[in-house]
From Swiss-Prot:
Positions of the catalytic residues: 263 (proton acceptor)
Keywords: Alkaloid metabolism, Methyltransferase, S-adenosyl-L-methionine, Transferase
Signal peptide: none
Temperature and activity: Optimum temperature is 35 degrees Celsius.
Family: Belongs to the class I-like SAM-binding methyltransferase superfamily. Cation-independent O-methyltransferase family.
Official protein name in the record: Norreticuline-7-O-methyltransferase
InterPro entries given in the database record: COMT-like, O_MeTrfase_dom, Plant_O-MeTrfase_dimerisation, SAM-dependent_MTases_sf, WH-like_DNA-bd_sf, WH_DNA-bd_sf
Gene Ontology terms describing biological process: alkaloid metabolic process; methylation
Source organism per UniProt: Papaver somniferum (Opium poppy)
Known function: Involved in the biosynthesis of benzylisoquinoline alkaloids. Catalyzes specifically the methylation of norreticuline at position seven to produce norlaudanine. No activity with norcoclaurine, reticuline, norlaudanosoline, norisoorientaline, scoulerine, salutaridinol, oripavine, salsolinol, codeine or morphine. Involved in papaverine biosynthesis.
Length: 357
């Protein structure tokens, strides 16, 4: 039998890691569903496996061995820490393993402003995974993989599934909170004195626009999105809500704001949306976008996330992430004269601010 070299073993390990890559996502989902982070956080001190099993919000008795093995994996993934505590009991040293939150686990606690729980539950979902299983079919045409897998577009799916729509809105709200914190604190010049009116196209439940309105009270803000999204958005005194279809009409303003909208669409659809924006932006106004910008050489720390998001867009709605050159080509086709790219440095630093004139 041929001896496997060290290099072959290393290369095989790479393939095995890819084969079992799903385990990271699904064990993360399991941790969120079982509320492991909240349980330990609320307890206030490290917990033994028996203490954790007794406090988890699970109706049936917990299998201690299986919970231990799940926690062992999550510790390996650096989501939780394990502490070995020695105590003296009647002359005998007793050793107990206890679990505590590692720094990333704070994002797995429901209810906090930093919570990424909606993103975990929204992305790592059986229906959301279904299109990925037929990814091969996307290589032979222009079919919408999500529609092929689930029989309907993602927008129709969300409108028919209120719970998933709410989770999706929660995920977008988290992202919006990170992005707008950077926008209003570090990039105030983007919202210059010349901007008196602003429309957030595809603004979801208004998280981003609420922050913009608070930071710049002189700007009259309008939230614009599909009817089922607007219906799920809270009433905000300083913001006007308008429902509609951006392919048909967009309210006019000095500035149009769009966060993670165009990556949902193919090039022709993007050009249609951009032309609508150009038609309604006041003279001297601009389009303000927050989008990922792919780097050609993939050397950025967020390159893998950006590339993964690109495939996610292809799978779920036929969209894509784009390079600077690809963005510039779209802006030119829509009749815009110039643009400016600014890489975000805090918050969700995988994204960029794009100003289009």
């Amino acid at each position: 039998m041929e001896v496997v070299s060290q290099i072959d073993q290393e290369n095989q390990a790479i393939i095995w890691k890819q084969i079992y890559g799903f385990s990271e996502s699904l064990l993360l989902k399991c941790a969120v569903q079982c509320e492991i982070a909240e349980t330990i956080h609320n307890h206030g001190t490290p917990m033994s496996i028996l203490e954790l099993a007794a406090k988890l919000p699970i109706d049936q008795p917990v299998n201690i061995d299986r919970l231990y093995r799940v926690m062992r994996y999550l510790v390996h993934q650096k989501l939780f820490n394990k502490e070995v505590i020695s105590t003296l009991n009647g002359g005998t040293v007793q050793v107990t393993e206890k679990y505590w939150l590692a720094p990333p686990a704070k994002y797995l606690i429901r209810g906090s402003q930093q919570s990424m729980v909606p993103s975990v539950l929204g992305i790592i979902d059986e229906d959301m995974f279904a299109p990925w299983h037929i990814l091969k079919d996307s290589l032979t045409g222009e079919c919408n993989i999500f529609e092929t897998a689930l029989g309907k577009s993602i927008s129709v799916y969300m409108s028919e599934n209120p719970e998933m729509n709410q989770i999706s809105n929660g995920a977008m709200a988290f992202d919006s909170g990170l992005v707008t914190s950077h926008l209003v604190n570090e990039c105030k010049s983007v919202f210059g004195d010349e901007i008196k009116t602003l429309v957030d196209v595809g603004g979801g439940t208004g998280t981003a626009l609420r922050a913009i309105s608070k930071a710049f009270p002189n700007i009259k803000c309008t939230l614009f999105d599909l009817p089922h999204v607007i219906a799920d958005s809270p009433e905000i005194p300083t913001i006007t809500k308008v429902s509609g279809d951006m392919f048909k009409s967009i309210p006019s303003a000095d500035a149009i704001f769009m966060k993670n909208i165009l990556h949902d669409w193919n090039d022709d659809e993007c050009i249609q949306i951009l032309k609508r924006c150009k038609d309604v932006v006041s003279a001297g106004g601009k389009l303000i976008m927050v989008e990922m910008v792919l780097d050609e050489d993939s050397f950025h720390p967020y390159s893998k996330l950006r590339l993964t998001s690109d495939i996610d867009m292809m799978v779920n709605n036929g969209g894509k992430e784009r390079t600077e050159k690809e963005w510039e080509k779209l802006f030119d086709a829509a009749g815009f004269a110039s643009c400016k790219f600014t890489q975000m440095s805090v918050g969700f630093a995988a994204q960029s601010i794009i100003e289009v004139y």
